[in-house]
Structure formats: C-alpha cells, structure tokens
A protein has these predicted regions:
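Carbohydrate-binding surfaces of carbohydrate-active enzymes
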Residues: 1-315
C-alpha cells in the first residue's frame, strides 16, 4: 500500500517477519525490472509491487536487507516446523488457506491440512498425527461444516482409533454427488459411531480405540485436556510472533517484535537441557546467552527486542 516509491526495507521487514512466523521460508524480490537507461530515474517500473533495481534510492544499501532475508531463509529451512495443531480446511472449492476456529491461544503454532494429505499421508505414531517427512501434530481440528466425504471420515475414524486426538463437530452428509444418497448414509453411520454420546455440553470428550474425540471445547480447553503446554510461553498482550524449527541437534525459535518500541520479555521455550544462543539475523553475529532458567516445562530466556527487531534463540546441546 501507500504512494508509489514510498516503501523501503524497514517497512517491508515487519510484514516479512510476520510471514516468516506463518511458515514462509523462501523469499524472492518482486519486482526486479531491467533498467536499460542511465539517465531516466526512477526508470522503467511497474504499477504494482515494490521496486528492486539499481536506480532505486536505497539500492546501494539493499545488500543489508537481502543478507538478512538470506539468513532468515536459511535458518527457517533447517529441520522440521513445530506446530501442535493441524486445522483441516474442509472440502469446498480449492483454497490456499483456511480459518483458525476455534482460535489458537498465544504460544502455539498451527498448520493447515487438506483432505488429500489426510487420506494419503497422515498416520499415527506415538500418539501423534504424523506425516511421512516427520512433522507431527497433537490435535486435528475439523471445521464447523456439515459435509465430509465418507472416505475421508473413515480415515479420520481410523486415525482416532490408532491414537489420534480430533476436535470438531460431526458431519451430516457428503459434499460430493458421487454415490449420492449412499454416501450420505455412510457419513451418517460413521458419524453416529464416532460422535455417539458426545453432545459438546455435558460430554465434551469420548475415548475411541486408542485415541479421543473432542467436541464443544475451546482450543485452550482442548490443549489443557491433553496436557499440551505452550511451545513458546508469552504474555497474552506481548506484540510478539514466533516460529519454531527443530533440527537434529538444535531447536530454533524465531521471535519477532511487531511493534515500533523496545520490549523486554521472558519467553518460556518448550525445550530443556540445551544451551541458549542468540543468532542475530541482521548482523550474522552469534553469542551465548548465559542468563537462562530451566523449569519443569522448558527453558526461560530473558530477551530484549528493539523496535521491529528479530531474535533467533538457538537452543543446542551443550
């Protein structure tokens, strides 16, 4: 937004950092237009996007910004993303995103997941919903929709019986015209088997096989019910966003101050027996953080974040 040529890296950084906490880990410059003339400034340009080219006033300093982006991309490509919750986006028209409902409390991360991945890839390992590459989730959340194909509902039933935890309402019919009426009866039968005795008011949780089905709970209630403490404990009003990657020998927490003011906080990371280090994505410097405290749930690390600053808290084996 804004007037033409008014956007500069300091403005882009805050928004970019927010996207990094949402899972983006491979950035590009949009747009970079070739400039054939030395005399005409600002040169050839587009009416959309931001201008990255040699006639831009801040081009001589742009390497500071691109070096920052490269460091962030590299760190966020290490290991696996840590998210406790997978929100199923439903089976409506194809979509790239979904909604977060029930709302996720601060200190937890989530992924969206679609029907294809659930049916083809998702399985249960050690009581956790697991994907073939290793990513795991504590809870699968179903959207507040009345439709689900019987094949997908059968797979979700198997996941629960194998040990998964699923939160959400019962579907009533199939969204597909395939096997019309027969599919609706299959959905009704499967839903009856799963949600029987679960009204979301007096009864909000039922065991099914090795797993559990929840209904009528907030995310706070559901996470507490399964004993899942925050991955990054933060004050509810802290203007901070975070992301977490787990590599072979280290946990990497990306902490972003989204406000134009200096803040001090004491995040509690759900990691123990590791030495915290501060990896500065702006300068590339690394330093050990000696002032930390281990708790029953994790590690508390005092941090001071300058306006719109980012902290990589890298916890590694001593």
């Amino acid at each position: 937004g804004g007037t033409p040529f008014s956007c500069y890296p300091a403005m882009m950084k805050q928004r970019g950092d927010r996207f990094f906490t949402e899972g983006i880990n491979n950035t590009l410059l949009h747009v970079y237009i070739s400039q054939p003339s030395e005399e005409r400034e600002p040169g050839m340009n587009a009416w959309f996007s931001s201008e990255f080219n040699r006639l831009n006033t801040w081009y001589p300093q742009m390497d500071l910004f691109t070096s920052y982006l490269k460091r962030v991309n590299y760190m966020l490509q290490q290991g696996l993303n840590i998210a406790d919750v997978a929100y199923f986006i439903g089976e409506d028209a194809p979509k790239m995103t979904g909604i977060v409902d029930p709302e996720l409390p601060k200190g937890y991360q989530f992924d969206y997941i679609n029907a294809e991945v659930i049916e083809r890839d998702l399985f249960v390992k050690d009581g956790l919903l697991t994907l073939p590459h290793g990513t795991q989730y504590r809870i699968l959340v179903l959207p507040k929709l009345e439709t689900m194909r019987p094949e997908l509902l059968a797979k979700i039933k198997k996941l629960i019986e194998d040990g998964a935890v699923v939160l959400g309402p019962a579907p009533k019919r199939s969204p597909s015209g395939e096997s019309y009426q027969t599919a609706d009866r299959q959905v009704e039968k499967l839903a009856g088997e799963l949600w029987s005795g679960l009204d979301g008011r007096s009864v909000k949780a039922v065991k099914r096989g090795k797993g559990e089905l929840l209904f009528g709970m907030t995310m706070e209630e559901a996470l507490k019910h399964i004993g899942c403490v925050p991955d990054c404990g933060l004050p509810a009003d802290a203007p901070v966003l975070y992301g977490h990657r787990a590599a072979v020998d280290a946990d990497i927490y990306f902490i972003s101050n989204q406000k134009d003011e200096t803040i001090e906080l004491r995040p509690e990371f759900r990691v123990r027996s590791k030495q915290p280090e501060l990896w500065d994505a702006t300068t590339g410097r690394i330093r050990t953080l000696p002032a930390y405290e281990e708790t029953a749930a994790g590690t508390v690390v005092p941090l001071k974040l300058y306006p719109y600053a980012v902290s990589y808290t890298h916890l590694t084996l001593p």
